[in-house]
């Protein structure tokens, strides 16, 4: 009898074990690729991750101007002043302007997004897919432009997501660099909206779009990049497109003589309808 009970117990345990093997648990601490690319809301959350690049631009990138006569830092121990006066020398091992690793990481993130978007493009309306691609290509051009400014437009340029384990990827030529930046930004200018509609419910949802890159941002970035490339006609044409979009110096209709000064008195948290602002 005891032997029979043992056999039944072992059999029951084995059956439960086999049944347990068929259970596919739902992970609650991460999302699969299919979930991340399943709908428009998740697509937008994916894109939001790139916007820290704009916040970073208005931090260290602007502060770099303090190494010239464009901007002044007040503190004698501000790093920019230490560099200028030689108290903190720049060396190959310690270079605060070095963005090689950071920008190449972002470059690959943009390529990975575009690769996955191409694989899941059928999940979205074509207009939304084009807008998403345009946003990602804007940011890819932005990080490549950052690399071009630092490394003479000769760096490791990935036009597509590289194969895992790929080594010895040759640096691009300056012509390849500027052509690729031009292609990305002209695509972005074509498919980004002139202005995001904050009240839209379809297809992006009800959340505000203030601060998202626009057609003007793409043309403006292209004009600046082409100046660095010394492609004067391309720079002039892009700047003209910005002008056509109606950007203008800020003025307060009720106090036209105080408009410019008021910009420096507004809180960052308060929204100002400012036609002078191209990239926020």
PLM-predicted stretches and their roles:
Residues 18-20, 144:
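Bacterial Sec-type N-terminal signal peptides, specifically the leucine/valine-rich hydrophobic h-region
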Residues 10-17:
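Bacterial N-terminal signal peptides
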Residues 39-56, 78-151, 166-179, 185-195:
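Conserved, well-structured interaction surfaces
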């Amino acid at each position: 009898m005891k032997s029979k009970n043992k056999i039944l117990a072992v059999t029951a345990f084995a059956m439960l074990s086999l049944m347990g093997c068929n259970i596919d648990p739902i992970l609650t601490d991460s999302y699969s690729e299919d979930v991340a690319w399943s709908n428009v809301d998740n697509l937008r959350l994916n894109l939001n991750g790139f916007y820290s690049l704009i916040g970073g631009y208005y931090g260290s990138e602007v502060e770099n101007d303090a190494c010239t006569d464009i901007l002044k830092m007040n503190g004698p121990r501000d790093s920019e002043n230490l560099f200028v006066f030689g108290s903190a020398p720049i060396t190959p091992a310690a270079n605060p302007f070095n963005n090689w690793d950071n920008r190449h990481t972002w470059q690959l993130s943009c390529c990975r997004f575009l690769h996955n978007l191409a694989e899941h493009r059928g999940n979205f309306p074509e207009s939304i897919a084009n807008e998403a691609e345009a946003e990602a290509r804007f940011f890819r051009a932005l990080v490549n432009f950052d690399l071009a400014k630092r490394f003479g437009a000769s760096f490791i340029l990935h036009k597509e997501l590289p194969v895992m384990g790929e080594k010895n990827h040759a640096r691009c030529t300056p012509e390849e660099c500027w052509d690729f930046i031009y292609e990305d930004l002209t695509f972005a200018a074509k498919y980004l909206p002139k202005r995001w509609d904050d009240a839209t419910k379809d297809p992006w949802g009800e959340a505000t779009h203030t601060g998202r890159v626009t057609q003007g941002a793409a043309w403006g970035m292209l004009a600046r990049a082409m100046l660095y490339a010394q492609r004067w006609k391309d720079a002039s044409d892009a700047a003209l497109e910005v002008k056509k979009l109606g950007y203008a110096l800020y003025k307060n209709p009720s106090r036209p003589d105080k408009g410019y000064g008021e910009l420096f008195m507004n809180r960052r948290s308060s929204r100002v309808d400012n036609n002078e602002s191209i990239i926020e």
